[in-house]
Amino acid sequence: MTNIRKSHPLIKIVNESFIDLPAPSNISAWWNFGSLLGVCLILQILTGLFLAMHYTSDTATAFSSVTHICRDVNYGWMIRYMHANGASMFFICLFMHVGRGLYYGSYTFMETWNIGILLLFTVMATAFMGYVLPWGQMSFWGATVITNLLSAIPYIGTNLVEWIWGGFSVDKATLTRFFAFHFILPFIISALAAVHLLFLHETGSNNPSGISSDSDKIPFHPYYTIKDILGLLIMLVALMTLILFSPDLLGDPDNYTPANPLNTPPHIKPEWYFLFAYAILRSIPNKLGGVLALVLSIMILAIVPLLHTSNQRGMMFRPLSQCLFWLLVADLLTLTWIGGQPVEHPFIIIGQLASILYFSIILILMPISGTIENQLLKW
């Protein structure tokens, strides 16, 4: 009799994806983040489901319903903070995952990479809409400012913004539809993640050396299941430490003030994980130019495979490209810092220089360093 694990139509899929999957023998901890993202997604869907049972998407009661969850619902405060800080964990894992892909040349798997970019956009949209739901000051003004960016689109901009708002300002209709979208998008993300995995398993995983590992594969279980569980435990300890000791560390105090359309907060800023893109947006004094730069700061990932000039896949043996990669990481951290600062000297010029450097590294310096390294190998 055949093993049910290998014969049953449904269990067979799980088996081929998580148990008998041939994996490279040398993948490092940087390959843990895919599974961590899966866990983050499940955690967000579950906590979100329980929050949705008590939340009301009405401008009059949204803020009060969140307060009610924190005060009166059994462990409601914990579910709420798991959801809010779980989003931060999600983005930390996302940035690490994308960074790993850039460093080790995983972007040469074009289908997997492009679905990944689509996933990144969808997760960002979901997080933005989720931030609007508590209906605090930063929720309201964040929604107003970010949706207003679409008015920069020539000819249809203003109509588009009013269509998204469902009126002439961010109001009840906006909150209701944002809640509906925020609820449905994680399930779309789940489907996209399954497709992402499907395309990955067509080619097999990349590995740190960047060369084919077909001659040296090991089964995913138990080697990488145990490794993933270790990564998971570390992440959960970090998340629970954040929730139980400093749950509001990454939030904005302004969001504990109910939304008031008549009172603008002094510094409107998004959650920390959007600050790098927000800094790029603000560094261009023209509205349409800023919006284009904002979109391109993420869309640029789609052309990274086309800019790959090196004969080697990853950066493991490419010191020049390594320097540029870590310069890019430092630059993104600088942009994140600038995005949270007021628009005044010297922050304006720092933001503009960091934005120029960001695009220069990816579009100009990386391809040049790849070509130089090819020449160095010939010598």
Curated annotation (Swiss-Prot):
Can the keyword Metal-binding be found in this entry's annotation? yes
Q: Which GO terms describe its biological process?
A: mitochondrial electron transport, ubiquinol to cytochrome c
Q: What is its main location?
A: mitochondrion
Instruction: Name the positions where heme b b562 binds.
Output: H83, H182
Q: Does the keyword Iron apply?
A: yes
Q: Where does heme b b566 bind?
A: H97, H196
- Transmembrane segments annotated in the record for this chain: 33-53, 77-98, 113-133, 178-198, 226-246, 288-308, 320-340, 347-367
From the UniProt record, which GO molecular function terms apply? metal ion binding; ubiquinol-cytochrome-c reductase activity
What is the membrane topology listed in the Swiss-Prot or TrEMBL record? Multi-pass membrane protein
Binding, a ubiquinone: H201
Concerning Pfam families, the annotation shows: Cytochrom_B_C, Cytochrome_B
Q: Which PROSITE patterns match?
A: CYTB_CTER (PS51003), CYTB_NTER (PS51002)
Identify its protein family: Belongs to the cytochrome b family.
> Which named protein is this?
Cytochrome b
